[in-house]
Amino acid sequence: MNDINPTPVDTPDDPRLEDYRDLTDIPGRRKLEGDEFFICEGPVAIERLFASGHHIRSALVLEEKAPRLQQLFAEYGTSAPLYTCDRNVMLAVTGFDLHRGVIAAADRKPIPKGTARHNVLAGLDKITVLEGLNDPENLGAIARSAHALGIQALVLDERCIDPYTRRSVRVSMGEVLHLPTMRFDSPDDLRNLLRDWTVWALTPHPLADNIWTLDVPKRLALMLGEEGPGLHEATMAVANQRVRIPLNDNVDSLNVGNAAAAAFAIVSRPSTS
């Protein structure tokens, strides 16, 4: 393992820190990052970033945080720049108090499109389909639960937020970086993509089947819709079955992140047969 020597930066207008500029400017960040790179923050998420195989562009850390990042750079053979600065410089660059003082930029992996999506899904047996999720924290929470509970890929419609937004990556604790992600553009496209899958649509409707009572199929795609409206009827029609999580009286529904975690745990439980 090679020793990595940090590069001190003492001014916020240093052009080498451009990837980290104004992180709270959402439109500006979309324009800057595009489909090229993303930001990961926090020690745990960054450890998961290194383990994910994404190419690291650079890291920016408070001076006292450098030793752990040096270990990660050496462990994974990373040759990207490791910049250090004080808290005032980091605040001026990023636009907010990054209290954990650890942030990195990494290149995105290409998103599979068209028939390439079938190749990605070929060896999998449990995936989730998300429609209309526009809250990065919900998506991040779902990705974290998915990877923890045996869900192997995310299939998103075009209205879902970018799963690589900084807040999604942070809330997922970096787990979203370990899940293949792809898009579908219409119910017909989704139906074609999932032609070899059993598809369940999760809904709070009382006439839907109790998910606890069902045998989990060999290949299952579990669909969830956005907070409030849920799945569109045309998307729901792709499903072979509509399922619900039974709730106590007077509770009509769960937050989509909580519902996803519960459903993932149910469908991934060991068989008792």
Where are these regions (language model features)?
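Amphipathic alpha-helical repeat scaffolds
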Residues: 42, 134-142, 254-258
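Boundary-proximal intrinsically disordered activation/regulatory segments immediately upstream
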Residues: 1-70, 160-162
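Short, aromatic/basic amphipathic alpha-helical patches
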Residues: 67-79, 234-235
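Active-site/ligand-binding-proximal alpha/beta "capping" segment
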Residues: 200-251, 255
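Short acidic-hydrophobic, aromatic-tinged amphipathic segments that line or gate anion-handling sites
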Residues: 6-13, 81-86, 179-189
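Structured adenosyl-cofactor binding patch, chiefly the S-adenosyl-L-methionine
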Residues: 104, 145-149, 163-176, 233-273
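Glycine/small-residue-rich loop that forms an oxyanion/phosphate-binding "nest" at active or ligand-binding sites
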Residues: 74-103
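RNA substrate-binding interface of SAM-dependent RNA methyltransferases
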Residues: 4, 110-207
